[in-house]
From Swiss-Prot:
It comes from Streptococcus pneumoniae (strain Hungary19A-6). Belongs to the NAD kinase family. It is found in: Cytoplasm. This is NAD kinase. The keyword DNA repair does not apply. The gene is nadK.
Length: 272
């Protein structure tokens, strides 16, 4: 069975096993008449781990409606694993049978407003975190224009449902199924004593809601967006909302369901 002209981009990390898989898969795709295209692909195959999938997402974050993703892992199982490195024949066969079906997950939109009028816009697949560079961060949390609390602590992170299994989970946040289009705000080492209090638990807000963080001091803050880190001074406010666009994965018989991904990543085999 031959392909009908699908354009595919392969993105791999520099590890020897990933590079070996990259060359082998590239050869198989060419032999089956797929088109390799690294600017306007139909499908992007990430080879490596979850970090590589995040890099692939950010490379094509402005083409999300036109691109579908596949995660091919060359190491231990990751959350975004669709195929393992020994399943290349299976992957190529499923690509030949592909009908365009997709599985979609929400994406986080982040707007950083600076006091000089600049606005920096980011998208995150997993989460966006903010910390103060050298001391306790103090920031007002506003939900839909209504002041909620004044936070004091190391920082805050806002995660998507798929990102709820990443940094958010290590902070004690809840795991959300991606069909629940919501954001989760989780504290990083909040300061709670007789003088200062915060809610002390994660906040889950629905798709239509907007979370604003307003730092009370104008010094440097570090903002992490997935696997990228930025430093800003004189932040006026930061807005977080579910983005209009979603990330789409190729829906094949091998696409692992969300709860199976959670089980494989964190629990493993369950004894009967």
């Amino acid at each position: 069975m031959k392909n009908t002209g699908k354009r595919i981009d392969l993105i791999a990390n520099r590890k020897p096993q990933s590079q070996r898989v990259l060359y082998e898969l590239r050869d198989r795709l060419k032999r089956n008449q797929f088109i390799l295209n690294d600017t306007n692909p139909d499908i992007v195959i990430s080879i490596g781990g979850d970090g590589m999938l995040l890099s692939a997402f950010h490379k094509y974050e402005n083409q999300l409606e036109k691109v579908r993703f596949i995660g091919l892992h060359t190491g231990h199982l990751g959350f975004y694993t669709d195929y393992r490195d020994f399943e290349l024949d299976k992957l190529v066969t499923n690509l030949q049978l592909d009908t365009g079906a997709r599985v979609s997950y929400p994406v986080l939109n982040v707007k950083v407003f600076l006091e000089n009028g600049e606005v920096k816009i980011f998208r995150a697949l997993n989460e966006a975190s903010i910390r103060r560079s050298d001391r306790t961060m103090v920031a007002d949390i506003v939900i839909n224009g209504v002041p909620f609390e004044r936070f004091r602590g190391d920082g805050l992170t806002v995660s998507t449902p798929t990102g709820s299994t990443a940094y958010n989970k290590s902070l004690g946040g809840a795991v959300l199924h991606p069909t629940i289009e919501a954001l989760q705000l989780t504290e990083i080492a909040s300061l709670n004593n007789r003088v200062y209090r915060t809610l002390g638990s994660s906040i889950i807000v629905p798709k239509k809601d907007k979370i604003e963080l307003i730092p009370t001091r104008n010094d440097y803050h570090t903002i992490s967006v997935d696997n990228s880190v930025y430093s800003f001074r004189n932040i006026e406010r930061i807005e977080y909302q579910i983005a209009h666009h979603k990330i789409h994965f190729v829906a094949t018989p091998s696409h692992t369901s969300f709860w199976n991904r959670v089980k494989d990543a964190f629990i493993g085999e369950v004894d009967e």
